[in-house]
Design a protein with these regions (language model features):
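Glycine- and aromatic-enriched mobile tails/lids
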Residues: 1-9, 13-174
Length: 174
C-alpha cells in the first residue's frame, strides 16, 4: 500500500524486492501474484463490500441506433498509421519541445476526428483501437512535455541533464 489510503502499487513502481525468475526486483510474475493477493486481502479487511457502490463511471452508454458502418475505413487506417509515424518521428528516444508540441497539436486533431467516428458510426474494433491509440499517444506526449530533464531513454535536447535532487531513490547494498 502506498502513502495514499487505498492506493496500491505493484511492478517496478512498487519497489518490493521480489525477484521471481527475473534478475530485476519488482518486475516479475511472482510480484503480480503475491502483491495482488496481498492487496486484495488488505482491501477486503478494511471495510465490507458496499452494495451501493457505483458500477459505472459516468461513461455515457453508446447506442448505435441507425448508424452505419464507416464508409471511409481507409481514413481510419490512415489515422492509425499516422499515429505510428507521428510517435516515431516526434516522440521517439531523442525529443525536442518543438517536436513534442507538434505531436500534441496533431493528436488533438486526430482526437476530434476519432470522436466523430466513435459517435457517428457503428463501433468496430478498428475504431476502438484507434481511439485507444490516440488516448495513449496523447498521454505519452503530455508526460514527455511535462518532463524537464533527460533520464534513461527519455532524452530531450532542450533538457539534456538529470534533476536527481527531485527524485527519492532506494539504494540496496548486497
Amino acid at each position: 500500500q502506498t502513502s495514499l489510503d487505498g492506493l496500491y502499487a505493484a511492478g517496478e513502481t512498487g519497489c518490493t524486492g521480489l525477484h521471481g525468475a527475473n534478475r530485476l526486483a519488482s518486475n516479475s510474475l511472482l510480484e503480480c501474484v503475491v502483491v495482488a493477493k496481498r492487496a486484495l486481502d488488505s482491501m477486503l479487511s478494511l471495510q465490507p463490500l458496499r452494495k451501493d457502490a457505483p458500477t459505472s463511471y459516468d461513461i455515457p452508454a453508446w447506442h448505435h441506433g441507425d448508424t452505419a458502418l464507416p464508409d471511409e475505413l481507409s481514413v481510419i487506417y490512415h489515422n492509425w498509421d499516422e499515429i505510428r509515424r507521428l510517435m516515431w518521428d516526434y516522440v521517439s528516444i531523442v525529443r525536442t519541445n518543438k517536436r513534442l508540441d507538434r505531436a500534441a497539436t496533431r493528436l488533438r486533431m486526430l482526437h476530434r476526428e476519432v470522436k466523430d467516428f466513435y459517435w457517428g458510426y457503428r463501433i468496430t474494433p478498428d475504431i476502438l483501437e484507434l481511439r485507444n491509440l490516440v488516448a495513449v499517444a496523447s498521454l505519452i506526449v503530455d508526460c514527455a512535455m511535462r518532463r524537464n530533464e533527460s533520464r534513461g531513454l527519455h532524452f530531450n535536447t532542450d533538457y539534456p541533464g538529470k534533476l536527481d535532487h527531485r527524485f527519492v531513490t532506494q539504494l540496496h547494498r548486497w
